[in-house]
Amino acid sequence: ILFVHGRRTFQWTAAERQALRKYVESGGLLFADSICASSQFAESFRREMRLTFPEQVLRRLPTEHELFTSDFGGFDVRQVTLRSPASQQDSSPSRINELKVTPHIEGIQLDGRLAVAFSPYDLSCALENQVSLECRGYIQKDAARVGSNIVIYALQQ
């Protein structure tokens, strides 16, 4: 399992894309998340997936995907809590909205297995217990469960 995350725009070289493709086609999993739901990182990651796997499409996993269930020894994460900064109109204190949602995980399937798993919402800061009022992502407990499911699921494919 190769884990990458970030918050800024990035670009891989042709050699890096080729090495990543070889790793994934050899059975590896690329697991990525966008720190604090950074749109810059998410756009860069999606572009790099199009360039690395031009014949594949990174698409959102459906709600009924086995990854979100406990069927394989993971957690039932079909509903999780997403923290989202509340918009402020004045100088009032910052607030967080907590929404019950289905996890947003995008994936690429190769030969019938999940080869790339990407969360456009933050997982890693929550896993590090770095909670910020400006950070859009899953609460710590749910981030741990979603991340665990990705790892457990990948190891059983």
List where the protein language model places each region.
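Mixed-charge, polar/low-complexity N-terminal
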Residues: V4-H5, F10-Q11, Q89-S91, I96-E98, ...
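Short alpha-beta junction capping motif
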Residues: F3-A42
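Structural recognition of the beta-strand scaffold that forms the well-ordered cores
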Residues: I1-V4, L29-D33, V57-R60, A115-F118
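Aromatic-Pro/Gly-enriched surface loop or interdomain linker
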Residues: I1, H5-T9, L123-Q157
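An acidic, glycine-rich "communication" segment
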Residues: F41-N129, A144, S148
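Solvent-exposed, flexible loop/coil residues
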Residues: I1, H5, A14-E16, H65, ...
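Sec/Tat-exported extracytoplasmic proteins
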Residues: G6, G28, M49-R60, A154-Q157
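Short, low-complexity, polar/charged sequence segments that are solvent-exposed and flexible
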Residues: R21-V24, R50-T52, V77-V80, E134-I139
